[in-house]
UniProtKB/Swiss-Prot annotation:
SUPFAM superfamilies membership: Nucleotidyltransferase, Poly A polymerase C-terminal region-like
UniProt comment concerning the protein's domains: Comprises two domains: an N-terminal domain containing the nucleotidyltransferase activity and a C-terminal HD domain associated with both phosphodiesterase and phosphatase activities.
Pfam families hit by this protein: HD, PolyA_pol, PolyA_pol_RNAbd
Note: A single active site specifically recognizes both ATP and CTP and is responsible for their addition.
The organism of origin for this protein: Alcanivorax borkumensis (strain ATCC 700651 / DSM 11573 / NCIMB 13689 / SK2)
Lineage, highest ranks first: Bacteria, Pseudomonadati, Pseudomonadota, Gammaproteobacteria, Oceanospirillales
Protein name: Multifunctional CCA protein
Positions of ATP binding: 8, 11, 91, 137, 140
Binding site for CTP: 8, 11, 91, 137, 140
Family: Belongs to the tRNA nucleotidyltransferase/poly(A) polymerase family. Bacterial CCA-adding enzyme type 1 subfamily.
Domain HD: start-end pairs: 228-329
Known catalytic reactions: a tRNA precursor + 2 CTP + ATP = a tRNA with a 3' CCA end + 3 diphosphate; a tRNA with a 3' CCA end + 2 CTP + ATP = a tRNA with a 3' CCACCA end + 3 diphosphate
Keyword flag Heme: no
């Protein structure tokens, strides 16, 4: 029995990055031998075990063969006779197909170290094209390591294009697409994930509403970058810069989808794009089975982001209607996410990257003022039933009005 550290731990160690997770491959062992040594079996499709002390995953070396469509369309074969190289060749990228022996020796049959040095994301073998999920994985790695200068190798991008054109991406289940997308959204350069998907044709297959924004112009006065898809990419870059939550980043992804439905004769203006964007965001969220709160925020940001941009112009009653839509009294964190997404939208424009966004602090302050209304005092004045509700609402609007006056006339 020989045990090797494999995959991401080896890759990140060679890059000088922190290793957060360790995966191991065991060559020359059987499931019975693993269990006899105290390992607990957890794999459903192939033999994977948890170490009795560290709880790290140990998988028996295995091969795989294409037997159907999609990510799950593979037959696996694990046996004590499977070699380390046979196990490594089934992996997606050369930089993920390295192993480290107990003594520290690096086993690198597919020149992963060469590609690490060249900053290339390159497929291990033509079998790469058998698994459509790898299109998303490569795009995610491109987003993760963009800051180090990594690029997708030309021949790998060609295989990704073939996969996108083949229709195989259509067999990916929604949960897998969302899992890869949500992970990519939280990377250091999330926009790169979608740029790579766009380059290989996968954006049109998986996110047609986003792909439809390519070439759609916006008013240059407000959007010096003009192109709406480029604006989306710039927004995601700002989202990472601002350290926004996953929910806020997903909301940004959906906030301008309605511009793809604007009649060409109306370009570059996009009247009522907010309503169209909200409708499309619901469609995307349903298709990808996006978690409820992320989906809700996406719809709200799509519908109300221009309210945030015009916050200082809005009447106090309109601001309170916005707050009610956001349900700020019960979900204060939603306002934080909403404003973060709106700020990234405002900054996600060529030459606007470092602009201040006073609307965020103004709306937070207005929300605080509305929350501080003394309901007991209103009850003491004799308000009750529906009249109490009306009095509370008017008091919140008045509190926002007072705050606005203080902000505009300090």
């Amino acid at each position: 029995m020989n045990v090797y550290l494999v995959g991401g731990a080896v890759r990140d160690s060679l890059l000088g990055l922190p290793v957060t997770e360790k995966d191991w491959v065991v060559v020359g062992a059987t499931p019975k031998e693993m269990e006899a040594n105290g390992f607990r079996p957890v794999g459903k499709d192939f033999p994977v075990f948890l170490h009795p002390k560290t709880q790290e995953e140990y998988a028996l070396a295995r091969t795989e063969r294409k037997s159907g469509h999609g990510y799950g369309g593979f037959t696996f074969h694990a046996a004590s006779t499977v070699s380390l190289e046979e196990d490594l060749i089934r992996r997606d990228l050369t930089i993920n197909a390295m192993a480290q022996a107990r003594g520290g020796e690096i086993i690198d049959p597919f020149n992963g170290r060469v590609d690490l040095k060249a900053r290339l994301l390159r497929h291990v073998s033509p079998a790469f094209a058998e698994d459509p999920l790898r299109v998303l994985r490569v795009a995610r790695f491109a987003a993760r390591y963009h800051w180090l200068g990594f690029q997708v190798a030309d021949d790998t991008l060609m295989l990704m294009k073939q996969l996108s054109d083949s229709g195989e991406l259509g067999y990916l289940v929604a949960e897998r697409v969302w899992k890869e997308t949500s992970r990519a959204l939280m990377e250091r350069d999330p926009q790169v994930f979608f740029q790579v998907l766009h380059r290989c044709g996968a954006l049109h297959a998986l996110f047609p509403e986003l792909a439809a924004l390519d070439g759609v112009p916006q008013p240059e006065q407000h959007h010096p970058e003009v192109d709406t898809l480029l604006h989306q990419f710039l927004c995601l870059k700002q989202a990472a810069r601002l350290g926004l939550s996953l929910n806020a980043r997903y909301a940004l992804l959906c906030h301008d989808l309605g511009k793809g439905k604007t009649p060409k004769e109306e370009w570059p203006r996009h009247i009522a794009h907010e309503i169209r964007s909200a409708r499309l965001s619901k469609k995307v969220s349903k298709r990808l089975k996006v978690p409820k709160e992320a989906a809700t925020l996406a719809t709200l940001v799509a519908e109300f982001h221009t309210h945030s941009h015009r916050a200082l112009e809005l009447k106090p009653a309109t601001v309170w209607k916005l707050f009610k839509s956001l349900d700020i009294l019960r979900r204060p964190e939603r306002l934080t996410d909403f404003l973060g997404a709106c700020e990234a939208d405002a900054r996600g424009r060529t030459s606007f990257e470092n602009r201040e966004y006073p609307q965020a602090s103004y709306l937070q302050g207005a929300a605080d003022a509305a929350r501080q209304v003394d309901i007991q005092a209103l009850q003491a004045q004799g308000h009750e039933g529906p009249a109490l509700g009306e009095a509370i609402e008017q008091a919140r609007i008045d509190a926002i009005a007072t705050f606005k006056q203080q902000e505009l006339n300090p």
